[in-house]
């Protein structure tokens, strides 16, 4: 188990004298990249009309949590590694430890809400606007912080410097069994539920793809028999919909029920909110009743083109959200496994520090993912970097 150094706040050890400079360099990169990237993200959400949606408030919440860590906490981690000594006193060590876990907890809870939202969009589109209404989204955001604070406030007396990772954290011995239960809820139950939601999204699209394949086979059979008017597929019954979880390009997943453009553009697209999905169902029924020729003409309208384009945007946004979750999880897995398998700290101290330092990645990686995987964020970032304050006038 970790040994607490709450007398002299030292994490000095001969085995890490050289490694500390690696940790300091990495910590500076995280602090600078995370601060700049997360500030740019908040500004992008503020100035880009197509990013100003209710659902994107979840992205903003995740960004605030990351900014709290990178801007306020990370510089003290760098200083502690550089001197191998916590130099700001016992009280701020408690504040640091408390805010560290609050930030991580808010991130996990927000990732859960994002995954839930993506799932509702594809599986229960009528339920989405009820859950993520104006009041619902505000309540969800406030709840992430209230729950996080309430979870870790009781540990206030036992936040100390943990020498093996040179970081202020809770004393695992004095915190038992509460801390074990708490970590299990957040990191095991919480992150597992996010993974389950994305699996459900993928399965939903896969089932719809199978239905579409059967539909295509029936259409091919009708064409081979030269049935009049059978050469046109009935629009509105099926739409291509990418789950966003494939490693390559968009998958061939198909939605067996129309998806409205407003629904699929909650993270990218115009700023309109999700509308009642009964219109989509009515459109489907009309398309099934109308002759194929009449329906084919209707496809040329602007609204239909937009509806056909929007599912691919759903896939891109879902893929981006999944990548954020994946990076967060992968950055924590080595640290969590090491603490489970090496509870008595028999592994070299530098190994524990390496695992702990890898968790820093989750504070700065998200803006990089947004820029790489989302056109709207990429354009907003580029405008901010090129034009500075003038960007605020450009997007209004």
From Swiss-Prot:
<feature type="topological domain" description="Cytoplasmic">
    <location>
        <begin position="374"/>
        <end position="396"/>
    </location>
</feature>
<feature type="topological domain" description="Cytoplasmic">
    <location>
        <begin position="48"/>
        <end position="57"/>
    </location>
</feature>
<feature type="transmembrane region" description="Helical; Name=4">
    <location>
        <begin position="145"/>
        <end position="165"/>
    </location>
</feature>
<dbReference type="InterPro" id="IPR000276">
    <property type="entry name" value="GPCR_Rhodpsn"/>
</dbReference>
<feature type="transmembrane region" description="Helical; Name=3">
    <location>
        <begin position="95"/>
        <end position="115"/>
    </location>
</feature>
<keyword id="KW-1133">Transmembrane helix</keyword>
<dbReference type="Pfam" id="PF00001">
    <property type="entry name" value="7tm_1"/>
</dbReference>
<feature type="transmembrane region" description="Helical; Name=7">
    <location>
        <begin position="353"/>
        <end position="373"/>
    </location>
</feature>
<comment type="subunit">
    <text>Interacts with ARRB2 and ARR3.</text>
</comment>
<feature type="modified residue" description="Phosphoserine">
    <location>
        <position position="221"/>
    </location>
</feature>
<feature type="modified residue" description="Phosphothreonine">
    <location>
        <position position="264"/>
    </location>
</feature>
<dbReference type="InterPro" id="IPR017452">
    <property type="entry name" value="GPCR_Rhodpsn_7TM"/>
</dbReference>
<keyword id="KW-0807">Transducer</keyword>
<dbReference type="GO" id="GO:0005886">
    <property type="term" value="C:plasma membrane"/>
</dbReference>
<feature type="modified residue" description="Phosphothreonine">
    <location>
        <position position="263"/>
    </location>
</feature>
<keyword id="KW-0297">G-protein coupled receptor</keyword>
<keyword id="KW-0812">Transmembrane</keyword>
<keyword id="KW-0675">Receptor</keyword>
<feature type="glycosylation site" description="N-linked (GlcNAc...) asparagine">
    <location>
        <position position="8"/>
    </location>
</feature>
<feature type="glycosylation site" description="N-linked (GlcNAc...) asparagine">
    <location>
        <position position="3"/>
    </location>
</feature>
<comment type="similarity">
    <text>Belongs to the G-protein coupled receptor 1 family.</text>
</comment>
<protein>
    <recommendedName>
        <fullName>G-protein coupled receptor 84</fullName>
    </recommendedName>
</protein>
<feature type="transmembrane region" description="Helical; Name=5">
    <location>
        <begin position="181"/>
        <end position="201"/>
    </location>
</feature>
<feature type="topological domain" description="Extracellular">
    <location>
        <begin position="342"/>
        <end position="352"/>
    </location>
</feature>
<feature type="transmembrane region" description="Helical; Name=6">
    <location>
        <begin position="321"/>
        <end position="341"/>
    </location>
</feature>
<feature type="topological domain" description="Extracellular">
    <location>
        <begin position="79"/>
        <end position="94"/>
    </location>
</feature>
<dbReference type="GO" id="GO:0007218">
    <property type="term" value="P:neuropeptide signaling pathway"/>
</dbReference>
<feature type="transmembrane region" description="Helical; Name=1">
    <location>
        <begin position="27"/>
        <end position="47"/>
    </location>
</feature>
<keyword id="KW-0325">Glycoprotein</keyword>
<feature type="topological domain" description="Cytoplasmic">
    <location>
        <begin position="116"/>
        <end position="144"/>
    </location>
</feature>
<keyword id="KW-1003">Cell membrane</keyword>
<comment type="function">
    <text>G protein-coupled receptor that responds endogenously to dietary fatty acids or nutrient, specifically medium-chain free fatty acid (FFA) with carbon chain lengths of C9 to C14. Capric acid (C10:0), undecanoic acid (C11:0) and lauric acid (C12:0) are the most potent agonists. In immune cells, functions as a pro-inflammatory receptor via 6-OAU and promotes the expression of pro-inflammatory mediators such as TNFalpha, IL-6 and IL-12B as well as stimulating chemotactic responses through activation of signaling mediators AKT, ERK and NF-kappa-B.</text>
</comment>
<dbReference type="GO" id="GO:0001604">
    <property type="term" value="F:urotensin II receptor activity"/>
</dbReference>
<feature type="topological domain" description="Extracellular">
    <location>
        <begin position="1"/>
        <end position="26"/>
    </location>
</feature>
<feature type="topological domain" description="Extracellular">
    <location>
        <begin position="166"/>
        <end position="180"/>
    </location>
</feature>
<keyword id="KW-0597">Phosphoprotein</keyword>
<feature type="modified residue" description="Phosphoserine">
    <location>
        <position position="224"/>
    </location>
</feature>
<feature type="region of interest" description="Disordered">
    <location>
        <begin position="243"/>
        <end position="310"/>
    </location>
</feature>
<keyword id="KW-0472">Membrane</keyword>
<feature type="transmembrane region" description="Helical; Name=2">
    <location>
        <begin position="58"/>
        <end position="78"/>
    </location>
</feature>
<feature type="topological domain" description="Cytoplasmic">
    <location>
        <begin position="202"/>
        <end position="320"/>
    </location>
</feature>
